[in-house]
């Protein structure tokens, strides 16, 4: 079972580390190509491209210019501990033990606009480059054209290494669009998390993101390997709904609190 999740815009490079173990990203040579493109952008270009404030644009221009392999624990941080968005609030990797990190390293991957595909313990330097950004590059008009084949190949390799063909898609649509599903040698299962509001169940972004992280945590800490085991997920009040689920989409619902 291989899980994929999205990265986060919010980063943490300051809190204590839950592990000292680290690995190097596999696609750094490709990342360097994007850095070379990004370094040609002015802060004004970055602000326009990413729809961010001038202050954030200056920060990210500095990050592109400061980006420099080789990565070490002194200038980089393990990806699973560096990302701090809603998904990672649910994941709570800062509470993992060493055996949890070992399982996650084999069974979890993070999609990334700059790094392509990251293992949990892969070191990364701070960046902001969302997959949906239309950054023209040597491979085409956007990051989807840059990463598509490379990511799909890397995921197929990861699937082969961990022993089965089961891929659990816990990434956002923006990020999973960077993968070419028809070329994936995998059965793709997508968990969907619905919350009740005014009597109707729907995807509420903040809750759904956190729930994806909770599902990752549940799989990692219970060392799950089968689809049937996922149906027992019950964290934070969610429950599997067999009536609205299908073979490749597992629906979990949470009722509104009275």
From Swiss-Prot:
GO cellular component: cytosol
InterPro entries xref list: YaaA
Protein name: UPF0246 protein ETA_07010
Gene Ontology BP annotations: response to hydroperoxide
Highest taxon in the source lineage: Bacteria
Sequence similarity: Belongs to the UPF0246 family.
